[in-house]
Amino acid sequence: MGNLDLEIIAQLTVVTLTLLAGPVIVFLLSVRKGNL
């Protein structure tokens, strides 16, 4: 059970980081385009 829990936590962490990084990357790209 412990291994399954770790895998679930790892997947949730990856999904969370992806959801958080998505908007940040879009924001940084828009800022760079604005500066150029």
UniProtKB/Swiss-Prot annotation:
In the record, biological process GO terms are: photosynthesis
Is this entry keyworded Secreted?
Answer: no
| A GO CC annotation given for this chain | photosystem II
The protein's topology relative to the membrane is: Single-pass membrane protein
Give a single Pfam family match.
PSII_Ycf12
Q: Keywords on this record? A: Cyanelle, Membrane, Photosynthesis, Photosystem II, Plastid, Thylakoid, Transmembrane, Transmembrane helix
Q: What does this protein do?
A: A core subunit of photosystem II (PSII), probably helps stabilize the reaction center.
Family, similarity comment: Belongs to the Psb30/Ycf12 family.
Q: How does it assemble?
A: PSII is composed of 1 copy each of membrane proteins PsbA, PsbB, PsbC, PsbD, PsbE, PsbF, PsbH, PsbI, PsbJ, PsbK, PsbL, PsbM, PsbT, PsbX, PsbY, PsbZ, Psb30/Ycf12, peripheral proteins of the oxygen-evolving complex and a large number of cofactors. It forms dimeric complexes.
Protein name per the record: Photosystem II reaction center protein Psb30
Q: Record the organism.
A: Cyanophora paradoxa
